[in-house]
């Protein structure tokens, strides 16, 4: 990635990976969802600050610590008590330590025991003011979830968590390379799964700024989930034409800008527009922006 020109023409191969011994950086993350149902609009937003510490152990191994600060929830349908409950649960994994290779493939979750201990402490505190069968069911679900490292890592790599930083686009590329993968979304339609096929390629290189951009496009796959979507839309009382209305991915665009000197992400975004007929629309935006020293002061 170091000895290249401002275009990707003539380049045989690009290897996007970490190039550093130690790196500390603050990021600003935001997620916004806008749902329109029968003309009614609901907006939900999450903002947080993330601090990353990347430390090289050896040629192939890195330790990455991700700490979350200042989480802010904006949702008019969620009470202050519910927001506080969600914030306390979110604190369980607001400090994670991962072992990865130089392409950010995760080898293991280093501090899983500490995360489980943190969960039990949160449950003990929350149980004093939150009671009932549903609360107990939630607590048990969380215990089961955080006892399974595979489920934790899948969640961590979700775009709404740390997926923009720990993105899957660290890889070797040629000018014609297209990297493909499948992503499952649970927030397009309530109680329904939507599968998206992502395709990524290198778009451009800015030699002066030492930046490389990978763009991502997406399309719906696995239509066998459509029955689940139809059922959820119907149960929500959303008006639609059963003869012609179908789930539709109107937009799925992503951009990942890498620092060519370090291999870390400088800026990343995913923009999604989904619809079902005229009366159900969902837009989702994920953004991660590197903060400079002036922003941190």
Go through each PLM region and give its residues.
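Signature of exported/secreted
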Residues: 2-297
